[in-house]
Regions:
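Structural scaffold elements adjacent to functional motifs in cytosolic proteins
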Residues: 45-47
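Short, surface-exposed ligand- or partner-binding patches at beta-edge/loop junctions that are enriched
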Residues: 89
Length: 127
């Protein structure tokens, strides 16, 4: 019987240290992403693709910070206002998901990834 109680105590102790998956709540569909941007004036649209990719076409008013810059990417992020809302995208959604994770680790609280990236973007783009 004591083994049963010990198992319950260990299980509950382990649950204390579990954190919800923050990334699952930061991935937004194109529709929700666009709607949320409108609801947050002053929000920043962040393109984490390379400069060449950015110049080939990007979402209007997007700021380009290349995720592949490594430490330079972190430096540029640290120069941003961590209290703003950030809507992040890349080509397909993979790099932007990584960027959102990095941003949250750096203390940004409102960061959102565009599912499918610019490949699935149906809105306007500029070159």
């Amino acid at each position: 019987m004591w083994k049963f109680y010990l198992s319950i105590v260990l299980l509950l102790t382990g649950c204390i240290y579990l954190k919800p998956n923050q990334n699952s709540m930061s991935d937004l569909s194109q529709k929700d992403w666009a709607k949320s941007i409108v609801e947050h004036p002053g929000a920043v649209v962040l393109d984490v693709r390379t400069e060449d990719e950015f110049e080939s076409g990007h979402i209007p008013n997007a700021l380009n910070i290349d995720l592949r810059k490594g430490p330079g990417f972190i430096d540029e992020l640290n120069a941003l206002d961590k209290n703003k809302f950030y809507y992040v995208y890349c080509r397909s959604g993979a790099r932007s998901a990584q960027a959102v994770k990095v941003m949250r680790d750096l203390g940004f609280s409102e960061t959102y990834n565009l599912i499918g990236g610019i490949l699935e973007w149906e809105g306007q783009t500029v070159e």
